[in-house]
Amino acid sequence: MAGARPGVHALQLEPPTVVETLRRGSKFIKWDEEASSRNLVTLRLDPNGFFLYWTGPNMEVDTLDISSIRDTRTGRYARLPKDPKIREVLGFGGPDTRLEEKLMTVVAGPDPVNTTFLNFMAVQDDTVKVWSEELFKLAMNILAQNAPEHVLRKAYTKLKLQVNQDGRIPVKNILKMFSADKKRVETALICGLNFNRSESIRPDEFSLEIFERFLNKLLLRPDIDKILLEIGAKGKPYLTLEQLMDFINQKQRDPRLNEVLYPPLRSSQARLLIEKYEPNKQFLERDQMSMEGFSRYLGGEENGILPLEALDLSMDMTQPLSAYFINSSHNTYLTAGQLAGTSSVEMYRQALLWGCRCVELDVWKGRPPEEEPFITHGFTMTTEVPLRDVLEAIAETAFKTSPYPVILSFENHVDSAKQQAKMAEYCRSIFGEALLIDPLDKYPLSAGTPLPSPQDLMGRILVKNKKRHRPSTGVPDSSVAKRPLEQSNSALSESSAATEPSSPQLGSPSSDSCPGLSNGEEVGLEKTSLEPQKSLGEEGLNRGPNVLMPDRDREDEEEDEEEEETTDPKKPTTDEGTASSEVNATEEMSTLVNYVEPVKFKSFEASRKRNKCFEMSSFVETKAMEQLTKSPMEFVEYNKQQLSRIYPKGTRVDSSNYMPQLFWNVGCQLVALNFQTLDLPMQLNAGVFEYNGRSGYLLKPEFMRRPDKSFDPFTEVIVDGIVANALRVKVISGQFLSDRKVGIYVEVDMFGLPVDTRRKYRTRTSQGNSFNPVWDEEPFDFPKVVLPTLASLRIAAFEEGGRFVGHRILPVSAIRSGYHYVCLRNEANQPLCLPALLIYTEASDYIPDDHQDYAEALINPIKHVSLMDQRAKQLAALIGESEAQASTEMCQETPSQQQGSQLSSNPVPNPLDDSPRWPPGPTTSPTSTSLSSPGQRDDLIASILSEVTPTPLEELRSHKAMVKLRSRQDRDLRELHKKHQRKAVALTRRLLDGLAQARAEGKCRPSSSALSRATNVEDVKEEEKEAARQYREFQNRQVQSLLELREAQADAETERRLEHLKQAQQRLREVVLDAHTTQFKRLKELNEREKKELQKILDRKRNNSISEAKTREKHKKEVELTEINRRHITESVNSIRRLEEAQKQRHERLLAGQQQVLQQLVEEEPKLVAQLTQECQEQRERLPQEIRRCLLGETSEGLGDGPLVACASNGHAAGSGGHQSGADSESQEENTQL
């Protein structure tokens, strides 16, 4: 749950090994008293340590799964035969007196109640000890029970061992193992092995490779294919070395791991994995991993869902006892219900072997003549077991699976001083030095002294029993008084002995030894008539005077008297049952009590003032729930120093359990459950205590142990100092989930703090497929786990009718990321042979949405710095050199240091934009200045709040995107202008040449006519007029021809410029919207920074006030400190509320300003279009005059200096010279607008 030591843990777990003696086998006589049978067998163990097997009388091999073995016993702890015939055959009663040393009993079963006993007697001496120790060591091996890579090998081994009389493997055994779909099995057998149902297989022909080939035919794996495709196999049936290495480092690696302590996988290590798991030599030679090898890797030891450190003893065991959750049992002796169940000594063995470190003993007075105290459930019809047998069983098994201390929780109803003395003597003689009687020197029983640690108490047994502090003289030490019947009810928990009942009272353990108290009517059953037995006090043993009683004894005596006076005799005790009838302890039993002294709980404040860590209290679950609801933080504080025990209420007559997580959440250590009932609470308890080496002790989270920290288990926010987790679980597929052809569904639950608990995520039900169902569904998200070290994840599979298949409990803080196989367990947390689930998990630290940018910058700082540099370069192209330098410094700051508002700057004229194509919009002068002024500096909110204004259009026109667009549009217009200019100049040259030629011909024609005719002057004049008229018409045609070309070109250019204008406006709108989005994001960051700054100012103010208050007198200081804290809270709440209101108003102002910018953009567009249209129209109207001036040499005021005028001014009468001039004009004027 918590408490892993810092740094890299040195793994202490060892893999299972089978010694040669067990592999070779030994001769034993197997006897069964019920069947009156005895057979000589040879016990063997397979080389992997999976199965114990022997050949029975019918020549068939019997097997026993090693993981089902719960204990092995030899000597006097082994079962002895009672049948005279079997005893005679085994040699009992003969000369050999060492026969007991040859006996061995193997206890096996799926849970602590349903156990079987296999009895053996060794033929040879010194054989039993080796077999017993090695079998128990293999059965308890933690690595063997957490090895998914051995699942298929184990199934293969079982088939190989179960041969028939001919020494062959029956095919029916294969069909039985995979009975969920026999048709698929038969098809796979035919395709893979060529055997039919009625045949058998020679063991040497049934290799592991053939078995795996059969499984590949039996199980199609579309889930693995999909994973390979997602990794990057791209339809190929293999992964390359680089792909495998990337997959492991990116998908399978926890990003939270330190790269120095846990470096990423290197190529050489990835190659070793391929060599280990790839069965195909061709792929192996090419450093490739096939689908089969990839599936093997997913189930390999390197890819466990949990690190081995979580399974190993990795927690600090040197903290006080109160710092641990302790595996605890209630009514340990019962095997079934609370009313008529069977009591069993074996249950104490099984509970302790299961890791329980606190067992309960309900002891009652024995009957004459033996007067042997016994254990039973008082006032019910449950059976009895002798106390001595129970203590011997505890002594035998207390430290077989865990060396850490065991607590014996006595509920003492023995109202006989003689029998209590016998109880104490049994404890001393049976436990010997293991029984802790005197407190340790380092940990005296004094106020303020913490409890010793589990490490200090290794191998010790502690007694929890009512301890009566008696005066040293004046009263016989052996006196014992039973409580009167009218004091039979307790108001809060158990009586001053803090003992625990469990059920309503129906009968009596003995008609002459138990108090006649019964509240069986609470459960509707008839009360049994009993004769009340008088207490020793009524018989004349009165208390002596306490004038010589020490202060502590007097104080405790007064407390007990107070309890008796305040008890309500009429209040029913249905929940608390027999605790009220417990008797006072004698000196003999009191002497055995030290660090676990039960006292009646009064209040948390009273316990804090007493400050006695060795005192503890017990709470029935209903009273504990009341305290948990009313005072959760005080409950946590109490459990930091003292022990508390929670036990089920008495109305749970079916031995059901409450959910232990409720009380773990407040740090209760001894959360006792009914171990015989494997319901969900007990399953959770068994799963949780599997970790930390199954020691029975789990270190509580640090926040629940530190005296300087307070913890609220009902918190819904992240606790300062605790790293919350985020977890995502996707159930992909299952394998061999049931032996029936049914649908399967999977539930995923989380147990932890109330805010962390989630129930129930559930997949859909597969359609009649329990072999290999595939669930392609969305993952289950646990976005925020506030206290991951106290949270557990449960993944459970069920058949469609709700029948339990298997489950697994995983500590959230230790779950690894990636794809993993999860082998399922039964209700008692024992591993199942084949059922498994393939899941995908993502485990990470929880990061609030507001801090995602910071987290990304920390995770990938190189990428973050590169992005900042890139942004700085982009800004440098838009703003001046000095501002660029300042912006670069700003971008290189951490995200928490950046300004929240976007600063505006004056736009820099674009050198390419020497003729503006749209008028500038209304310009504002935004600033990011503080709202505070000299008159407002006293206003705390105004001094913190900064104003943010929208960026104006003029500044956004200088955006890089706009500059780039204008550059492209200018280039486009220049190209179009060049094209038109070339056509116009060429036509102008031709027209000028034609005019020059016509002019020359016109001058010569009148002279020739005069010479030839010389007749009439009038005719000559008339002819000149006609020539002049024709020349003018020629001129007009020339002008019109050039005018039509230029007007068409002007219209094309106008259309292109209008198109550019629309593009520019659209792009400007996108820039505006992007700027607004960025501004809102930065405004959100600015809000958080302003809140933090406000809180810092308030905290500083509070600290200053506290420093001043500490200088005052003590009584004034406390009052003033209280007032300072109250004022600080009020001022903080009000100030943050005012700041949030001001921030909201600022947000609204910014939104309104941004809307004005957008409206300005919308209103501006038609004006720009009209202006551009007018400008183009004016240029088009000037074209006729330009052309006439160019062609005819006319001059007129107001004519533009167009290219045609330049052509005309250079003169074209010189022919080629005119052409050269036209070319020069083109090169000189190509950048001038028409």
UniProtKB/Swiss-Prot annotation:
Description of how the protein assembles with itself and partners: Interacts with LPAR2. Interacts with SHANK2.
GO BP: any one term: phosphatidylinositol metabolic process
Residue ranges of every copy of the PI-PLC Y-box domain listed in the record: 589-705
The keyword Nucleus is assigned to this record: yes
GO molecular function terms attached to this record: calcium ion binding; calmodulin binding; molecular adaptor activity; molecular function activator activity; phosphatidylinositol-4,5-bisphosphate phospholipase C activity; phospholipase C activity
Cellular component terms per the entry's GO annotation: cytoplasm; cytosol; nucleus; postsynaptic cytosol; protein-containing complex; sarcolemma
Name of this chain's protein: 1-phosphatidylinositol 4,5-bisphosphate phosphodiesterase beta-3
Organism: Rattus norvegicus
Active site annotation, chain numbering: H330, H377
Key words of the record: Acetylation, Calcium, Cytoplasm, Hydrolase, Lipid degradation, Lipid metabolism, Membrane, Nucleus, Phosphoprotein, Transducer
EC number from the UniProt entry: 3.1.4.11
Region (Interaction with SHANK2): 1231-1234
Tissues/organs with expression: Expressed in parotid gland, brain, liver, uterus, lung, heart, adrenal gland, and ovary. Not detected in spleen, pancreas, intestine, thymus or kidney.
Disulfide bonds: none
Main location: cytoplasm
Region (Disordered): 465-586, 886-936, 1196-1234
Every C2 domain range: 706-834
Phosphoserine: residues bearing it: S472, S488, S493, S535, S925, S1105
One Pfam family recorded for the sequence: PLCB1-4-like_EFh
Regulation: Activated by G(q)/G(11) G alpha proteins in response to ligand-binding to G protein-coupled receptors.
Enzymatic reactions: a 1,2-diacyl-sn-glycero-3-phospho-(1D-myo-inositol-4,5-bisphosphate) + H2O = 1D-myo-inositol 1,4,5-trisphosphate + a 1,2-diacyl-sn-glycerol + H(+); a 1,2-diacyl-sn-glycero-3-phospho-(1D-myo-inositol) + H2O = 1D-myo-inositol 1-phosphate + a 1,2-diacyl-sn-glycerol + H(+)
Modified positions (N-acetylalanine) in chain numbering: A2
Biased composition (Low complexity): 486-513, 924-934
Primary role: Catalyzes the production of the second messenger molecules diacylglycerol (DAG) and inositol 1,4,5-trisphosphate (IP3). Key transducer of G protein-coupled receptor signaling: activated by G(q)/G(11) G alpha proteins downstream of G protein-coupled receptors activation. In neutrophils, participates in a phospholipase C-activating N-formyl peptide-activated GPCR (G protein-coupled receptor) signaling pathway by promoting RASGRP4 activation by DAG, to promote neutrophil functional responses.
Comp. bias (Acidic residues): 554-566
